[in-house]
Amino acid sequence: MDVTLNEVEVRVLGSLIEKELTTPEYYPLSLNALTNACNQKSNRDPVLNLDEGEVVRALDSLKFKQLALLSGEGGRVPKYRHALMEKLRLDPPELAVLAELLLRGPQTVGELRTRGERMHPFPDLPAIEEVLEELMARTPALVMRLPRQPGRKDSRYAQLFAGEPQTAAEQSPPPEAARLRVVAENERIGHLEEEVVHLRGEVAELRRLVEEFKSQFE
């Protein structure tokens, strides 16, 4: 992508797309409705707790990046919509897949089909794969296939509006509990060895003083 979005912008954009596809009768969205959509607990990973100020700042940034618009200016209540149709010429299947990736993060083809059904009907897995291939073939690409995770059969796909995600291989794995225990034990043993050396020095000094004291009476 030629723009990079932060976490809040990603959530706002994904929510706008989702509501257009699932509840078109209530779209475009007011600020209050959009904030509620961003914070809803279902179909979100992670669940966020944004306030209206954070959503407004994200909207301003998305408008500057030509990804969102104020709809029906001059109306009693300002309403907002995404601008992906105008900017990127995306069709409903592509929008549904992108919305799911924006709202939940990297997912497999199977997960995208199951979860994306509420926004657009996908007859089978090849239909999802075709959409993903189209999104990856764009210039710049909107989606990428991630390296397969150890122990997982299927690859996951990620949106690129927020830049390339860090793969598991690139992340520093958290220390294993057993390894942490070994490190702590080694540190404790090291401290004990230092104390033993110190005590031996004190004992040797005491012996020397005792010998000096005894020599005074010989």
Swiss-Prot record:
InterPro entries: DUF480, WH-like_DNA-bd_sf, WH_DNA-bd_sf. The lineage of its organism: Bacteria, Pseudomonadati, Thermodesulfobacteriota, Desulfuromonadia, Geobacterales. Pfam families: DUF480 (PF04337). It comes from Geotalea daltonii (strain DSM 22248 / JCM 15807 / FRC-32) (Geobacter daltonii). Disulfide bonds: none annotated. This is UPF0502 protein Geob_1184. Belongs to the UPF0502 family.
